[in-house]
Amino acid sequence: SVLTFEHQEDAQRLGFDKVIMQAGGIGYGKADQALKDTPEKNDKIVILGGENYRIGMGGAAVSSADTGALSSGIELNAVQRSNPEMQKRAANAVRGMIESEENFIVSIHDHGAGGHLNCLSELVEDTGGHIDLDQLPVGDPTLSNKELIGNESQERMGLVIAEKHIDTLQKIADRERSPMYTVGNVTGDHRFVFESKSTGNKPMDFNLEDMFGSSPKTILEDKTIVRNYKSAAYDSSLIQTYLEAVLKLESVACKDWLTNKVDRCVGGKVAKQQCVGPLQLPLNNVGVMALDYSSQEGIATSIGHAPVAALIDPKAGSRTAITEALTNIIWAPLKDGLQSISLSANWMWPCKNEGEDARLYSAVEAISEFAIDLGINVPTGKDSLSMKQKYP
């Protein structure tokens, strides 16, 4: 969203200036493909996708830091880049396994913040694993061991597969032109090790219980700041002027802030997109993807956001955002009514500003209570807590 807002109240200026882009994907999975198996000793650890670069270092930690608080070098190395072509190749290789008569993938995990360290350790958290540093794909030869292990080059998937099925996966990966690397073994010793066979260098060797079982809880302390806002002054004779001003807000009368660029019909399953009519104005309240080319079933998505309301009252902002999303999605015929709906809660918040952690707690609490009252689940979400901006 390029929607910005500022408000002067007493000696404080409140508002939001940062440009936000929220992107997400929708889809469905078969129930028999949803449950992971437990890796067994001597199973192979495999990576599908691209090479390692100095990308996404610091991951979640940097994304939640104040903009301008860290050096430009750290922030630059934390930036994520994308390679959709590589993502598609890796996804097609996984899809090839899923659509086979029997899916031989034991367990699979994406590469998020923390890179190989996060992905591969979670694959073997019940068993243990040994990763050969020499087998990890390197796109930048200047990477240190820390950068090689922890970067967030995103177009990659980590998976575990039995050694006897490696050839099947390799054939599918070759067909889809997806790079594939066998980088380690499941050990069964409940340790997670990165080691170079050529040099003997071992930058990491941990007990799994030290990684997963004893993480200290983070305690955040903040104080509640009460802000009293003056009542809005208005003149009933200027209703036409007020109406025109409100309708000029992009978040009110136009869905332009979602996006109205590029072709969103690739694949032929887009039943309803943002743009509508001969002028392709982005006015639709809901987007709909068909599940296939012949049935009348699909997946509907909508969005709700209420940043101005949340500035005044975080609880009201949470409830308003959910309400907006629901009033947008009612134009799709939901098979099971509200029971058909799942929410993704996305928090864009200036944490570490005095009083903002307390406001965020209130907002999350309100989401939870409101969703429970409605009988709607919130299985996922995303936080971006670096919305605090330092101006020179």
Labelled PLM ranges:
Residues 1-392:
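Glycine/proline-enriched, intrinsically flexible loops and inter-domain linkers
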